[in-house]
From Swiss-Prot:
<feature type="compositionally biased region" description="Basic and acidic residues">
    <location>
        <begin position="12"/>
        <end position="27"/>
    </location>
</feature>
<feature type="compositionally biased region" description="Low complexity">
    <location>
        <begin position="118"/>
        <end position="127"/>
    </location>
</feature>
<keyword id="KW-0489">Methyltransferase</keyword>
<comment type="function">
    <text>Histone methyltransferase that specifically trimethylates histone H3 to form H3K79me3. This methylation is required for telomere silencing and for the pachytene checkpoint during the meiotic cell cycle by allowing the recruitment of RAD9 to double strand breaks. Nucleosomes are preferred as substrate compared to free histone.</text>
</comment>
<feature type="domain" description="DOT1">
    <location>
        <begin position="214"/>
        <end position="531"/>
    </location>
</feature>
<keyword id="KW-0808">Transferase</keyword>
<keyword id="KW-0949">S-adenosyl-L-methionine</keyword>
<dbReference type="GO" id="GO:0005634">
    <property type="term" value="C:nucleus"/>
</dbReference>
<dbReference type="GO" id="GO:0042393">
    <property type="term" value="F:histone binding"/>
</dbReference>
<feature type="compositionally biased region" description="Polar residues">
    <location>
        <begin position="79"/>
        <end position="102"/>
    </location>
</feature>
<keyword id="KW-0156">Chromatin regulator</keyword>
<dbReference type="InterPro" id="IPR030445">
    <property type="entry name" value="H3-K79_meTrfase"/>
</dbReference>
<feature type="binding site">
    <location>
        <begin position="352"/>
        <end position="355"/>
    </location>
    <ligand>
        <name>S-adenosyl-L-methionine</name>
    </ligand>
</feature>
<keyword id="KW-0805">Transcription regulation</keyword>
<dbReference type="GO" id="GO:0032259">
    <property type="term" value="P:methylation"/>
</dbReference>
<dbReference type="InterPro" id="IPR021162">
    <property type="entry name" value="Dot1"/>
</dbReference>
<feature type="binding site">
    <location>
        <begin position="437"/>
        <end position="438"/>
    </location>
    <ligand>
        <name>S-adenosyl-L-methionine</name>
    </ligand>
</feature>
Length: 531
């Protein structure tokens, strides 16, 4: 029964000027319909993406807008979950991706599952997988809510304070036809989606199209040259239809004002609505027609310099876009060869496991990292975290890895990352990926002296390596933050030569479910501050 249809159990006093008497509230007539009281439970998902470290379930703060000013947003528990010293907040809605195996959420991101590394019993090497939670049945029903301008802006902008020192526009962004008259710059050397998901790769045509009809092109905000796609579907392959829909949504909602983006995101006539309706009806020709319309209309705005002007007023990238760019890079470089990461030496320091995108976002925010600071990842794997810090924050970002296969994949990601950033028109921070033992790499030892945040995923490190790291921390500057899965301070406070106790202040924290690749469970981590 609805709470508005229950009989009142209370009596209240109503004060009148000269007379005081007890008045019983009128009893409401009981409703014949049976309705339940809505509840806000802790809806769980196996892989969560949750933005923002140390945030409360509802917090207001300043975020960048296209006009260069800031506005205040409040994030509900359905969008964020906080990290606390005592408990883990139930997992929330932002679910994506991650290292090494991105997962899936219901907001239109890639729905394909990564290839499983056949080492499920070899924790922590085993990446975490989730089932596809998307359904074509929820295409049109919630369309207007999904495209409501205020909700869309709330999704796009983050709670991170504005970093006014960050310059977001890529130096090689296409500035329109006038720029071509001066110098015609070649397009970025990306790995096109059609190179990894196509009929040639034994995929099947999607949306009822014939083989000769699947080829399409997709326009991006930063370059005049589009990406080639084939509208196909296949196991462990890029979902071209969802990828295209997501690019259209992010390009319009991030790079344009509400008025400029109306043609793409209008509730009734928007191009994105046309794409979704065509997908739900398996209308291939209709989908292709809507895509051509998007390409033409967005290119018109690019020719007028609208994208460049708007980017110049922005100082940060929405996390939704950060995650999507990183996933695009991963899909085209690591995913086709992910089985290489299963080759490791059991019981050694060379065990592969990654921290997922939302965990890194939390860390970057909690440590107050900005574009003028330095981030170092010791044991950087395929480079996911190093690239994320450079893109999300714009800071100088270093990584060092000694496993050969991981290093090779990291280099492939690095090349595609630079090309993708240019394709999207955004400038990342400087990235440096080093090979070898970080205890002996001269460049790493030198950059540690000026590092502001150091990440060490020491979940599977030997005690000897952890002790070696403590010795390296002696060279860190005062105030440097060290993020680790295990503490470097011994439980025995009287342990001889316990250097960590004398140089580190340690804060113990809890992360929610889905934050790491080797398990879906929650866990603990530490933030140590050099003193």
């Amino acid at each position: 029964m609805s709470i508005f249809n229950q009989k009142s159990k209370f009596k209240i006093k109503t004060e009148i000027r000269t007379v005081r008497e007890t008045v019983e509230r009128p009893k409401l007539k009981a409703s014949t319909s049976s309705s339940s009281i809505p509840t806000t439970g802790s809806s769980q998902h196996s892989n969560v993406r949750i933005a923002g470290a140390g945030s409360s379930l509802s917090r207001a703060s300043s975020t960048p807008r296209l006009n260069g000013t800031s506005h205040t947003t409040s994030t509900s528990s359905s969008a964020r979950a906080s990290l606390t010293k005592v408990t883990t907040i139930p997992t929330a809605r932002r679910i994506q991706s991650a290292s090494p195996i991105p997962s899936i959420n219901g907001d239109g991101r890639s729905s394909r599952k990564r290839r499983a590394i056949k080492a499920s019993s070899r924790s922590p090497i085993s990446p975490h997988f989730s089932e596809d939670s998307d359904s074509d049945s929820n295409g049109d029903e919630n369309w207007e809510d999904n495209l409501d301008a205020r909700k869309r802006r709330k999704r796009v902008h983050d709670e991170r304070p504005v970093d006014v020192n960050r310059k977001l526009r890529h130096p090689k962004i296409w500035k329109g036809e006038e720029a071509d008259q001066v110098e015609r710059i070649p397009g970025p050397a990306i790995i096109h989606a059609a190179k990894v998901a196509s009929l040639e790769h034994k995929c099947k045509p999607a949306l009822g199209l014939k083989n000769e009809e699947v080829a399409v092109r997709l326009q991006y905000p930063g370059a005049r040259y589009p990406e080639r796609y084939e509208l196909v579907e296949g196991k462990d392959k890029i979902d071209a239809v969802k990828d295209i829909e997501k690019v259209v949504q992010l390009a319009a909602s991030t790079y344009l004002t509400d008025e400029e983006g109306k043609i793409f995101l209008d509730h009734q006539t928007g191009i994105l609505r046309k794409l979704v309706k065509s997908k739900n009806r398996s209308d291939g020709p209709g989908f292709k027609a809507a895509l051509r319309e998007y390409n033409d209309e967005f290119l018109k705005l690019m020719r007028k310099g609208v994208i460049v002007r708007n980017l110049d007023k922005m100082h940060g990238i929405p996390r939704e876009l950060v995650d999507f760019i990183l996933d695009q890079v991963y899909d085209r470089t690591v995913a086709p060869r992910v089985e290489l990461l299963a080759k490791y030496q059991n019981g050694s320091d060379n065990v592969y496991g990654e921290l997922n995108h939302p965990f890194i976002s939390d860390i970057l925010e909690r440590t107050n990292l900005t574009s003028d600071k330095v981030f170092v990842d010791l044991g950087s794997g395929v480079g996911n975290v190093t690239l994320q810090a450079a893109l999300e924050i714009g800071c100088e970002s270093w990584g060092c890895e000694m496993m050969e296969n991981a290093c090779n994949l990291a280099e492939a990601q690095y090349d595609e990352f630079l090309a993708r950033c240019r394709l999207w028109g955004v400038k990342p921070g400087k990235v440096r990926l080093e090979r070898g033992d970080f205890r002996k790499n001269e460049k790493i030892l030198e950059v540690l002296k000026r590092a502001d945040v150091v990440l060490v995923n020491n979940q599977a490190f030997t005690s000897q390596l952890n002790d070696n790291l403590v010795s390296m921390f002696l060279d860190l500057k005062i105030g440097c933050k060290i993020i680790s899965l295990k503490t470097f301070v011994h439980d025995n406070k009287n342990a001889e030569n316990d250097v960590a106790t004398s140089i580190l202040d340690v804060e113990h924290l809890t992360y929610p479910e889905g934050y790491v690749s080797w398990t879906g469970a929650s866990g603990t981590y530490c933030i140590s501050t050099r003193r």
